[in-house]
Swiss-Prot record:
Name the record gives this protein: Phosphoglycerate kinase
Reaction it catalyzes: (2R)-3-phosphoglycerate + ATP = (2R)-3-phospho-glyceroyl phosphate + ADP
GO cellular component, one term: cytosol
Record flagged with keyword Methyltransferase: no
Keywords of the record: ATP-binding, Cytoplasm, Glycolysis, Kinase, Nucleotide-binding, Transferase
Enzyme class: transferase
Annotated CDD domains: Phosphoglycerate_kinase
Molecular function as annotated in GO: ADP binding; ATP binding; phosphoglycerate kinase activity
Assembly mode: Monomer.
Length: 393
């Protein structure tokens, strides 16, 4: 089902539009180290500005645990927005209360203001009705554009929609469109590349994508549990012993469905898990008992390249090795390059794989790079996200 968007709303002129954004950006000593999420909100903000809206932005930042903590103030975001929008974005000292509401009522068409961190109130994460009502008093219309928080049923993502007409922004629409396309109607051949360290955090995604995929590539730390389940030795590599049967049953299911599963055929290993460890190549499925698997080898990459070249749809979620250590990032870098050069629909879903694509400067060559970490993962698991459900037509 598609969602209602800003384009479905008649007129924003003169209206206070409460826009839930995801400005949960990384801060280093009070300054923003990556403004990707702020830039992702700009198309919606610009669209509303052009239509004479009075824009009241709302977001969370970090985990202040329901208390006012200026370390988590959105002030740096207001400063960055002022530069990006080329206009003064006023920072309000709170997100609810009569003084704040009065200030929003004094706004002029085209004004943009930012409310203080909603998570300074414990009621936000509890989706407290009274808090949601107070928050809704800052707007006449609600626009939800925080896909990164859409898997949370909080007051600012779900609760306010009980009190205001609600539509999705362009980012929410884009995420729903591309992730939805991958799940509902992927053009074949469809290749799912799933990495990351733990089977426990990715098995639901693997199972959700299995019946739709032609090929599933499994890499990262979780691949060793799959290899172990097939009887290979994995040395000191990461093993989730309680997921050996789960891995085994997944591989059996894939075989029954005729889905090809690519596991590491060779490895880059090390003596210990350390960024300064010396990489060593093992041209075998088996890893020596005193070694740790850290990355995929050249034969595995050749196998992945064959399927990526002919793919019409690719979803990639999670790194293929310990990419945060430069010596063990080559497998992930090569896969990022392969995905970027694929002519089909390519979607990179959330978290570390997005960081990898950015690290190797390839994001502009990917059809869609998702901004949601946990939200992308839950969407790909086939779960209904509460922040999207409230926007459905």
């Amino acid at each position: 089902m598609s969602i209602k968007t800003v384009k479905d709303f008649n007129s924003f002129a003169g209206k206070r539009v409460l826009v839930r954004c995801d400005f949960n950006v990384p801060l280093k000593e009070g300054s923003i180290s990556d403004d990707t999420r702020i830039k992702a909100a700009l198309p919606t903000i610009e669209y509303l500005k052009e239509r004479g809206a009075r824009i009241v932005l709302v977001s969370h930042l970090g985990r202040p645990e329901g208390k006012k903590n200026l370390k988590y103030s959105l002030k740096p975001v207001a400063n960055r927005l002022s530069g990006l929008l080329n206009q003064d974005v006023k920072m309000f000292s709170d997100c609810i209360g009569s003084e704040i509401v009065n200030n929003t009522l004094q706004m002029k068409d085209g004004d943009v203001v930012l409310l203080e961190n909603v998570r300074f109130y414990a009621e936000e994460e509890k989706n407290d009705k009274n808090f949601a009502k107070k928050l809704s008093e800052n707007g006449d219309v609600f626009v939800s554009d925080a896909f990164g928080a859409a898997h949370r049923a909080h007051a600012s993502t779900v609760g306010v929609s009980d009190y205001l007409p609600s539509v999705g922004g362009f980012l929410m629409e884009k995420e729903d469109k591309f992730l939805g396309e991958v799940l509902k109607n992927p053009e074949k051949p469809f290749v799912s590349i799933i990495g990351g360290s733990k089977v426990s955090s990715k098995i639901a995604v693997l199972e959700s994508l299995l019946s739709k995929s032609n090929v599933v590539v499994i890499g990262g730390g979780m691949a060793y549990t799959f290899l172990y389940s097939k009887g290979y030795s994995i040395g000191k590599s990461l093993l989730e012993s309680e997921y050996i049967d789960t891995a085994s049953s997944f591989l059996r299911k894939a075989k029954e469905l005729g889905v090809k599963v690519i596991l590491p055929l060779d490895h880059i290993v090390a003596d210990d898990f350390n960024k300064n460890s010396t990489p060593e190549y093992i041209d075998s499925l088996n890893i020596p008992e005193n070694k740790i698997g850290m990355d995929i080898g050249v034969n595995t990459l050749k196998e992945i390249e064959k399927v990526v070249k002919t793919a019409k749809t690719i979803i990639w979620n999670g790194p293929l090795g310990v990419f945060e250590f430069d010596s063990f990032s080559k497998g992930t870098a090569k896969v990022a390059e392969m995905v970027a050069s694929c002519s089909g629909l390519t979607v990179v879903g959330g978290g570390d794989s997005v960081a990898a694509v950015n690290k190797f400067n390839l994001s502009d060559k990917i059809t869609h790079v998702s901004t949601g970490g946990g939200a992308s993962l839950e969407y790909l698991e086939g779960k209904i996200l509460p922040g999207i459900k409230v926007l459905e037509k």
